[in-house]
Amino acid sequence: MNWRRISSHRLVSQWTGKSWRSMHSPTLFRMARALQENPKHWPDGATLLDDKVALQSIRALRSKWRASSATLEHHDHGAGSRVKHGSGQTNRAVSHLARHVLTQESDAEAMARWLRSLDTHGKVLELGTSLGLTAMHFVRSGWDVETWEGCPNTMAWARSGWQSLGVEGCVRSRVGTFQSMLEDLDENACWDVVFLDGHHEGQATRHLVDALAPRVRQALVVDDIAWSEGMHEAWMAVQDSEDWRVSVVWRGRGILLKAPHMAKQRVCLA
């Protein structure tokens, strides 16, 4: 495993990355402040909306699922989960997914704050719904949330969670392969920010990033860029595209910014 891949890992980048205090660009300065965890330094306007869905409600649901004895018949169209269960038809314990696969609360809240700091309203697309908790955090940003999932059973579980918290009307959801849903899009469909957290395979990731680029107004986030050699190679490759001016590594994720006003650059945030 090479150093660049190691330094992109969530547990490493938070120690080797730069603080928000060292960001000279106003765009990166505001972004880095929103992503860090000390409320004292959050940018103005980044506070999330408890009236949409309370953090305590999401936290309680996460805890409930961690203790659940339920299983899901799960079909993975990609390369398996970030803990490397194989692809294909498998029975997956909900407790396992809740403990090891879901985005951590601190990261999901930070990304929702970042959305809120970009604008009070926008459109965000998530590819890889899983149990639906990240989408709930995104609802707290006040943005329109759309999420895609390959497994019907997983999506059904996510929808039941949204319904239990009364946010089912705040999330638009679709089921199918990412490729088929991309092909079905209206030619004018676009989002301000896209989060790609599914199909953890290098070539597929490169294809999805390239296909989504014309439909992204501001930023595209690639999760698990250090998950495998192929994923890291894909991340290194997509940064060179002229579609993106700035690439940011943050907690095991790669963030691509259109930012036409900025010089081409690569940054690692703590």
Residue ranges and their predicted role:
Residues M1-V193, H200-A219, I225-A270:
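A short alpha-helical cap/connector motif
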